[in-house]
Amino acid sequence: MALPILLDCDPGHDDAIAIVLALASPELDVKAITSSAGNQTPEKTLRNVLRMLTLLNRTDIPVAGGAVKPLMRELIIADNVHGESGLDGPALPEPTFAPQNCTAVELMAKTLRESAEPVTIVSTGPQTNVALLLNSHPELHSKIARIVIMGGAMGLGNWTPAAEFNIYVDPEAAEIVFQSGIPVVMAGLDVTHKAQIHVEDTERFRAIGNPVSTIVAELLDFFLEYHKDEKWGFVGAPLHDPCTIAWLLKPELFTTVERWVGVETQGKYTQGMTVVDYYYLTGNKPNATVMVDVDRQGFVDLLADRLKFYA
C-alpha cells in the first residue's frame, strides 16, 4: 500500500525535482501539496507548484498557498539562487488549474482528518506552515506519522556561517517542529551537500529524452551555475530537497543517527542554527533522525530510474 504524504514546499529548483520524484514513485500517495514562502515570494512559489503539476499532468492533486511571512520575522527569499521566477531556466507551462479556496493549514488539516492512516508530512521549505498546523490543531498530531524536513546542518551553514537557509528564514517555526513530540527526520546540509548532481548526471537525465527529464536537466543547468562559485568547493549542484523523498523510497541509501536537535532563535551569530547533540551532552532524549551520509551514485541512479516513468 502506498505511503500517504503531504508535501509542503517553496519551489525552487530542488523542490520542483522533489515533486517530480515523488509523483514518479508508486510507493507514495501524494495527498496534497502546499506552498510556503522561501525560495521566492508566496505568490511565485504557489504558481510554481501549479506549473509543475500542470507539466506532470497531475492537476488532480489539491494545492493551497501558505503563510506569506514567517511567524515572527520579515520574509527573506533566495532569488539569487533560483532566479526571478523561482524556477528560472526551462520554459514551464502556465497553470491550467487553480489552488483550493483555503489556506495551506486548512488543506493540511482536512487531509489529515480524512486520511484512514497517519500521514507523513514532507517539508522542503521554511517550517512556517507546519508549525501553524501543529499549533492550531493539536488534536491532529496523532494523524501525523512523521515530519521529514530538508533543513539545518550539524556543521556549516549555507546562508550564514551557522545556519542553513530554510531554518534561518523561520527559526521559531523550526523549533516548534523539532520540539513537537512528533518523529522528525532531518535532511540537513551534512547529507544534501553530498547529494551533488554532476554535469554528466544532468546529461544522463537529458538523454532519457522525455519532456519531464528534459525539464529536469534544464532546471539543473540553471541551478548548477550558482553552485560553480569556488567558495562552495562543489563538483556539481547539491540536490537538497529530493533527499527527503529519496529517504522515503530507499532509506538504505542514507546513513542516519538518532539525536536531539534544537534551533537557536536568539543568537547574535547563530540565529537559525540547528544545534545537534551529537555526543549526548545535554541529557535530552533524541527527537530526530538526522541524515549524515548518502550513497551519491545510488541517489543519482534512483532519480534517473524514476524519470523514465514520464516516457
UniProtKB/Swiss-Prot annotation:
- Enumerate the active-site residues: H240
Give the EC number(s) listed in the UniProt record.
3.2.-.-
| PROSITE patterns per UniProt | IUNH
State the source organism's domain of life: Bacteria
- One MF term in the entry's GO annotations: purine nucleosidase activity
What the entry lists under InterPro entries is as follows: I/U_nuclsd_hydro_CS, Inosine/uridine_hydrolase_dom, IUNH, Pyrim_hydro_RihA, Ribo_hydro-like
Q: Which keywords are on file for this protein?
A: Glycosidase, Hydrolase
Which GO annotations describe the biological process of this protein?
Answer: nucleobase-containing small molecule interconversion; purine nucleoside catabolic process; pyrimidine nucleobase metabolic process
Q: Which top class of enzyme applies to this chain? A: hydrolase
The protein's matches in Gene3D superfamilies, at most eight in alphabetical order, are given as:
Ribonucleoside hydrolase-like (3.90.245.10)
Q: Which GO terms describe its cellular component?
A: cytosol
Its function, per the record, reads:
Hydrolyzes with equal efficiency cytidine or uridine to ribose and cytosine or uracil, respectively.
Q: What's this protein's family per the entry?
A: Belongs to the IUNH family. RihA subfamily.
Protein name in the entry = Pyrimidine-specific ribonucleoside hydrolase RihA
Q: Which organism is it from?
A: Escherichia coli O157:H7
